[in-house]
UniProtKB/Swiss-Prot annotation:
Belongs to the MAPRE family. GO terms for molecular function: identical protein binding; microtubule plus-end binding; protein serine/threonine kinase binding. Keywords: Cell cycle, Cell division, Cytoplasm, Cytoskeleton, Golgi apparatus, Microtubule, Mitosis. The keyword Cell division applies. It comes from Gallus gallus (Chicken). Pfam families: CH (PF00307), EB1 (PF03271). Residues 175-245 form the EB1 C-terminal domain. This is Microtubule-associated protein RP/EB family member 1. The gene is MAPRE1. Plus-end tracking protein (+TIP) that binds to the plus-end of microtubules and regulates the dynamics of the microtubule cytoskeleton. Promotes cytoplasmic microtubule nucleation and elongation. Involved in mitotic spindle positioning by stabilizing microtubules and promoting dynamic connection between astral microtubules and the cortex during mitotic chromosome segregation. GO terms for biological process: attachment of mitotic spindle microtubules to kinetochore; cell division; cell migration; establishment of mitotic spindle orientation; microtubule bundle formation; microtubule polymerization; negative regulation of microtubule polymerization; non-motile cilium assembly.
Amino acid sequence: MAVNVYSTSVTSDNLSRHDMLAWINESLQLTLTKIEQLCSGAAYCQFMDMLFPGSVALKKVKFQAKLEHEYIQNFKVLQAGFKRMGVDKIIPVDKLVKGKFQDNFEFVQWFKKFFDANYDGKEYDPVAARQGQETVAPNLVAPVVNKPKKPLAPQRPIVAQRTPATPKGSTGMVKKAAGDDESAGLIEQINVLKLTVEDLEKERDFYFGKLRNIELICQENEGENDPVLQRIVEILYATDEGFVIPDEGAPQEEQEEY
């Protein structure tokens, strides 16, 4: 079982943000640049695996998490590990996943003390433990979309100007190469957008599932005439002005005619 740590006050033993990041990156062979990137919860899960092998289901941890519901899933894995090892600490998941510096810094300060109280110095291969999975910094993924805006094409006409004896046909080749670069950039951008759409669909399904669970609870207690419950139902079923709910009973053939 784990040795619990209850002190969270600021002391001279607390590491600075830079020293904290250096410790995390060295221990887990990561490349974090900001404390806020700990909001994914993945690093904490791996630290628990280092301290107490088998205490967390490391295979369930999403090391490339980019969305809030994926962060929440990682923290659920961490919570299960805490419970298994008797760690008496409430994880403020709702605050941590927002990626705010202060909340994440306070939690990692506590976690560092918890780690020091429980680490026995045994060797640990973090890369092998996560099966070689590369980690992705939560707030450094989006800029990838901008990469296609820097094509190599403008550099090529300069080369053509330095060789006046080049046949006219070479100009067409340069334009073709520039077109190929532009096409490759567009394809890369499309692939990034597809991944973004997939992530958004997962997030949509996640929140829809929550709303569905709330709806079921309201239906189960429908006869209690609770004004709060009735207000929740009104909010769930409220629609924007002009919105028309599709007629689910309409024949399939009629829909196909349009």
